[in-house]
Swiss-Prot record:
This protein's encoding gene: exbB
UniProt keyword list: Cell inner membrane, Cell membrane, Membrane, Protein transport, Transmembrane, Transmembrane helix, Transport
UniProt keyword Nuclease, yes or no: no
Function summary: Involved in the TonB-dependent energy-dependent transport of various receptor-bound substrates. Protects ExbD from proteolytic degradation and functionally stabilizes TonB.
Subunit structure: The accessory proteins ExbB and ExbD seem to form a complex with TonB.
NCBIfam families: exbB2
Membrane topology: Multi-pass membrane protein
PANTHER family assigned: BIOPOLYMER TRANSPORT PROTEIN EXBB, PROTEIN TOLQ
Protein name stated in the entry: Biopolymer transport protein ExbB
Subcellular location: Cell inner membrane
Length: 145
C-alpha cells in the first residue's frame, strides 16, 4: 500500500471538505427545525424551576454554535489544500500559463464559499433561536412573579 501523495490529496480534498460541510449543514438544519418545533410547543406552566426551563430551551444550541463557528475554517482548509495542489502542479510541470492557474485558484475557493454558505444561515438560525430562548425565559420569570 502506497503512502501519501499529492494525487491522492487532489482526488479526495473536495470530497472530504464537501462531505464534512454537507453533514454540518444537515445537522444545522435538523437541530434548527427541532428547536423551532420545541419552542412552538413548550408549555411554560409545566416548569417549576427556571434552571430546568433554561436547560430545555438551550438544548442543541451549542451544536449550532459549533457549526457556524467552524464551517468557515473547514472551507478555508479545503481552499488551502487546493492551493497547495495548484502550487505542486506548477512546480512539477515547470510552469503553467496564467489561465490554468486562475482556473485552479477559482476552483480552490469554492470550499471557502461553501463553508460560508453553511456558516451564515446557521449563524442567523442560532441568533434567532437564542433570542427566542431568552424571550421564553423572560416570559417564565414574569409569569412566576
Amino acid at each position: 500500500m502506497g503512502g501519501f501523495s499529492v494525487g491522492m490529496l487532489k482526488d479526495y480534498v473536495d470530497i472530504f471538505v464537501f462531505a464534512v460541510l454537507g453533514v454540518a449543514s444537515f445537522l444545522a438544519l435538523w437541530f434548527a427545525i427541532e428547536r423551532v418545533i420545541f419552542y412552538s410547543k413548550v408549555d411554560l406552566k409545566a416548569y417549576d424551576d427556571i434552571d430546568a426551563l433554561n436547560l430545555d430551551l438551550t438544548k442543541n444550541l451549542t451544536i449550532l454554535y459549533v457549526i457556524f463557528s467552524n464551517a468557515p475554517y473547514v472551507g478555508l482548509l479545503g481552499t488551502v489544500l487546493g492551493i497547495m495542489v495548484i502550487f505542486y502542479d506548477m512546480g512539477v510541470s515547470g510552469g503553467m500559463d496564467a489561465k490554468t492557474i486562475m482556473v485552479g485558484l477559482s476552483l480552490a475557493l469554492k470550499a471557502t464559499a461553501l463553508g460560508l454558505a453553511v456558516a451564515i444561515p446557521t449563524l442567523i438560525a442560532y441568533n434567532s433561536l437564542l433570542r427566542k430562548s431568552d424571550v421564553l425565559s423572560e416570559k417564565f420569570r414574569i409569569m412566576k412573579k
